[in-house]
Amino acid sequence: MDKLQRDGKEDTPRQRRFLYPLLFQEDLYAIAYDHYFNRSSSFEPMENSSSNDRFSFLTVKRLISRIRQQNGSIVPFVNCDQTKLVGHNRSFYSELVLGGLTAVPEVPLSIRSKHSLERMNEWTSFRSIHSIFPLMEDKIPHSNFILDIRIPHLTHPEILVRTFRRWIQDAPSLHSLRSVLHEHRNLIISSNLDQLILIASKENTRLSLFLWNYYAYECESLLVPLWKRFFYSRSLPYESFIERTPFYRKIEHIVIFYHKYLKKSLWFLKDPSIHYVKHRERSIIALRGTYLLAKKWRYHITKFWQCHFHLWPQPYRIYIDELSNNCFSFLGYLLSVKMKTSVVRIKMPDDSFITDLITKEFDPIAPTTLLIGSLAKEKFCDISGHPISRLAWTGLTDDDILDRFDRIWRNIFHYHSGSSKKDGLYRMKYILRLPCAKTLACKHKSAIRVVRERFGSELFTKSSPKERESIFLSFSKTRSQRERIWHSDIIQINPLINSCRKKHNLQIEPLFDR
């Protein structure tokens, strides 16, 4: 694998034809175990781990010898019988086999992505989810329509094998992958871990996530060449200035130029700007044009997916929203474009007059109703927003109770600090403060008034003074309530909104915290 990485810059086909022998190398399973098992160990309690789930080269040697006895087939070990594997449980052998099978196709793909990332800027804020919103804030107000795309569900395992042929030319590896995929036809359904339909609950998730990410990359890569060709086509891009708006309306986007020999050609002055953002299985395409142009893009995307993957992507998975009339949900926000009217005084040499200037403004709003629903799902309040005490936390110390409520509040506020309206966040803070006081009152068997006198009016005391000062300044009346702040450190999923998505069955993307 080190040799493959040293020669990865060449990316010759020879490097992709000898991947199957890696399945018989002991180091591959050690790397897969260290990469996957140790990563997930911090999220699993110690009581759930088994003493047999420890890596052993002796176990790997037995596994490789059994694979050789099966004529190189690894499928029998995916659903092997526990009685035939004395001393080790079935799940551990399945973990090793699927971990090794996942590590093999990752070799050429990781080499390619590694060298592509080396050519990028060292600025690391691109990992933040909030880095999407400044782009949308600058570009979406100049767009007319939004294509809200859900990546089509995978229907047949042979589609994945055919897409892997472009990067992996090792036939035995492809045959092994095909055997496992046909053995588990429901291996991959969605990128959401909670919606994965798996035959074995735990050991297939890593392979499923890898296959889904590769499948989503293939769906996305089909559109990039088309957008580049459209962008570099014979068009005259322009910037829309306010004082030139009547001029653009008069020419109706088309100008006829007469050349010699009286030949005329049409030059489109429409702005071919296409802005694209993606998160998990959802993609957003912002277009500047008419409704007919948006319908054409939906038709072409559907046809490209149909011809490339030999499946029928449902057209209803591509929604067309008009920004002037509708809002759309993305990454835990309700996004829309609203008209902003400003009074402007125009002064001329002889006279001056006052007129109204209408501009478009990006308007992200925190979905307060959905956030209250997620808190109700987690038993912090009822469906109407009335606070409820957390009786399950009464066995914790006072500091632990305060710390848990404080982290929930800071995560919600930190993520939705880009909201144009902060009134909903005031309500969320009120809802969380009362359950905190009620929980402490139930623990000490006292009244809420006594708890407030003991801990003060500010119950959330576990945050650092710098963070409390930042939150206080953000909510200060002297600051503009419409000021938006986008943070570059939000990279992890907050499970609070995941429960909200399950309950309301809406396409609301998960909330993120630091």
Curated annotation (Swiss-Prot):
Protein name: Maturase K
Domain of life: Eukaryota
GO-annotated cellular components: chloroplast
Family per similarity comment: Belongs to the intron maturase 2 family. MatK subfamily.
Organism: Encephalartos altensteinii
Listed GO biological process terms: mRNA processing; RNA splicing; tRNA processing
InterPro entries: Domain_X, Maturase_MatK, Maturase_MatK_N
GO molecular function: RNA binding
Keywords in alphabetical order: Chloroplast, mRNA processing, Plastid, RNA-binding, tRNA processing
